[in-house]
């Protein structure tokens, strides 16, 4: 059964394993998420559930959002996400999904929005080496030639050039759940995940985990 939760990145810390190893972890507030809608293959063409996260007052949401959440018997939510599932009958509208959906040792994929760095040059954005810093050199951080004039007389697609860095959807795969605090809905994920503090993330079962 596929599992997934919407969460919020709290920050990074470190814990120590029983054998004394120091493990860097990212703390994620995962859930509670409420099942808002069920989609079936017969009606919608695929099996999925829609979950809501970060409850807010109905007065602060538009009428369409309030009406959509009414069937779940809960107020409005700030964020929604669909999750493909194998057996949609395992869920009911109004079910609450918490951090205990995952357990220590699970392998997961985490999706978030990377921190935006603004407009950056090719050295920071793509890791170009750059030119010499010595006296007399007139080539330091410039990208250099981007193509020939006669042939091909154009710049190829996907040419590495200066531009916007960060602020894009990033998925880090095959991370390990180190610890789960069900009481506070916290999941400790080994390593780093995309996004800034309090950034929205989506946790789901890894698609490349070894069976």
From Swiss-Prot:
CC annotations in GO: cytosolic large ribosomal subunit
Molecular function as annotated in GO: rRNA binding; structural constituent of ribosome
Record keyword RNA-binding present: yes
UniProt keyword list: Ribonucleoprotein, Ribosomal protein, RNA-binding, rRNA-binding
Gene3D superfamilies in the record: 3.30.160.810, Translation factors
Family: Belongs to the universal ribosomal protein uL3 family.
Official protein name in the record: Large ribosomal subunit protein uL3
Organism of origin: Geotalea daltonii (strain DSM 22248 / JCM 15807 / FRC-32) (Geobacter daltonii)
């Amino acid at each position: 059964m596929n599992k997934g939760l919407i969460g919020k990145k709290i920050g990074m810390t470190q814990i120590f394993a029983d054998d004394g190893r120091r493990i860097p972890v990212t703390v994620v507030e995962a859930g509670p998420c409420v099942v808002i809608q069920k989609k079936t293959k017969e009606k919608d063409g695929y099996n999925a559930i829609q979950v809501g996260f970060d409850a807010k007052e109905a007065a602060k949401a538009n009428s369409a959002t309030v009406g959509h959440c009414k069937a779940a018997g809960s107020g409005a939510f700030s964020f929604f996400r669909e999750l493909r599932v194998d057996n949609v009958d395992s869920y009911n509208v109004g079910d609450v999904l918490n951090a205990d959906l995952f357990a220590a040792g699970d392998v997961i994929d985490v999706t978030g929005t990377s921190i935006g760095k603004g407009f950056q040059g090719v050295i920071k954005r793509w890791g170009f080496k750059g030119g010499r810093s010595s006296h007399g050199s007139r080539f330091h951080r410039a990208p250099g030639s981007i193509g020939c004039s006669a042939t091909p007389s154009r710049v190829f697609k996907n040419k590495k050039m200066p531009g916007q860095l960060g602020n894009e959807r990033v998925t880090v795969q095959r991370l390990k759940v180190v610890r789960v605090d069900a009481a506070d809905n916290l999941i400790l994920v080994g390593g780093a995940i995309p996004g800034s503090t309090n950034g929205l993330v989506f946790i789901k079962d890894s698609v490349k985990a070894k069976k």
